[in-house]
């Protein structure tokens, strides 16, 4: 079994903010594109986790899914 690389500190902080349901929705929505700009596989997984979170608002889930799609395009182009 391969070990997973540790999550970078910046990404961990952004994930914490995006997942904190006690924070304002607008703040959480602002964090999602920031996660996407990191453009890593870990960021993609984090975005998919947000998109799959039933407690997140529809807007958060939709934005996370759209952002994940963009990150996936970037990751796919790096492999070509």
Per-range role (PLM):
Residues 7-11, 44:
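Core helices of alpha-solenoid repeat scaffolds
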Residues 79-80:
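Alpha-helical repeat scaffolds
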Residues 40-46:
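Short, charge-rich amphipathic alpha-helical segments embedded
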Residues 13-15, 46-48:
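Buried hydrophobic core positions in alpha-solenoid tandem helical repeats
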Residues 18, 50-51:
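Low-complexity, intrinsically disordered tandem-repeat tracts enriched in small residues
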């Amino acid at each position: 079994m391969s070990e997973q690389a540790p999550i970078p500190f910046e990404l961990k902080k952004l994930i914490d903010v995006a997942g904190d349901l006690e924070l304002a929705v607008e703040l959480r929505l602002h964090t999602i594109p920031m996660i996407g700009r990191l453009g890593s596989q870990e960021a993609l997984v984090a975005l998919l986790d947000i998109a799959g979170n039933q407690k997140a608002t529809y807007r958060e889930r939709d934005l996370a899914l759209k952002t994940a799609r963009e990150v996936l395009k970037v990751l796919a182009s790096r492999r070509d």
